[in-house]
Amino acid sequence: IAHKKNMLTTSYVSPEMSKLDEKAKEAGIIIMNEIGVDPGYDHMTAMDIIDRVHEEGGKIDNFHSLCGALCAPEASYNPFRYKFSWSPKGVVMAGNNDAQYLENGKVINLDTTLLFKNPLEINFPGVELMHVYPNRDSLPYIDLYGIKEAKTMYRGTFRYPNWCAALDLLKALKLTSYEEQDLKGRTYAQLTAEINGLDANNLKEDIKTKYTIDENHAGLKAIEWLGVLDPKPIPLEKGSTFDLTSDLMIEKMMMEDDERDMVIMQHIFIITRANGNREKIVSRMIDYGDKHYTSIARTVSLPAAICVKLILDKAITETGVHIPIKKSIYFNVLNELKKHGISMEETTTKL
C-alpha cells in the first residue's frame, strides 16, 4: 500500500487483510486473495453459475461446493488411500477444525470430534464413490456469493473411502493433539496406550473393545499400518502426537516420482427458475498431474498467474481487497484457464 503496488495471494483473506480495503482503494491498488484452486477456482466457477441463475430470475435453494487434492486412483493403494501432493502437516491440521454449515435452513455446528463421522457419500464419475467431510465454516459464503435465499450452504473436502474412518480413530486416540509430551525412551505403542488408559501389551485388542470395531475396520487397518501401535522407539525426546503422526505420514505417504496426483471439484446446485421449475445443476472438474507438473501446482498457480497478467494488462481494474467473485474479475480468468485445459463440465437435470 505504501508503495502503491498491486498484490496477489492464493491464501484466504484474513480479518487483518480485510481491514486494508479502504487504504488499498485510496492507494489505487488491488490486493487480490483466494485466487488458487480452493480457494479460487471454486469461487469463480460457482459465481459463474450463480450469476447466470440470478440474471435469468432464478434462485439458489441448495449449494454444495466440494474439492479434493488427492493421488490418482491407481496410486491410492495404501490403507489411508491418500498420498500428499501438498503441505502434509496442513492436511492433518485441517482435520482438527470444527465445522459449521447450513442444512435445510438450520445451522449445523460440528465439534472437531465429530468432523469425520458420517461423511457424505458423493458419486464422482470417472473416479468412484467419494467421501466428503465439511470445511471449517461455510456460512460466510452465503453473503459472499450473494445467495441469501439458500437453505443449504455446504463446502466440503473430497477423500477416498478409508480416510475419514482412519482420521476419526486417530483423533479418538488423541494422536493428532498439539499438546507437547515427554517422549524420551518410549515406544509408539506405549505412548498410544498411556494417553488412552490402555494396555501397551494388548493395545490393538483394547482399541477394538473400546470402540466396538473389528479386525477389518478401515481405520484400525490404517493406523496399524502407519505404525502408531508399534513397539518401536520414538525418535524424539519431546513433541506432540500431531508431530509424531504427521511425521509417520510424511515417511510413508508421499507421492512417488512416477505417480500422478489429481484435483477434483464438484458444485451441486438445486435451483428454482423464475417460472417455478426446479433443476439440479452439477458442475465437475477432474485434473491429473503429469510428468512435468502436479495437478495441485497447475490448478493453484495458473489462476494466480492469469490474474496477474490481467491486472498488468488493465483488463482487471478493480481496487481494494478482493476475492475473485465479481464477473469483472472471474470472467476473463475462466476463459484463459480453458485455454490451458482447466474447465468444468456442467449438466442440468429437471426435478
Regions found by a protein language model. Name each.
Residues 23-71, 308:
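Adenosine-phosphate binding glycine-rich loop
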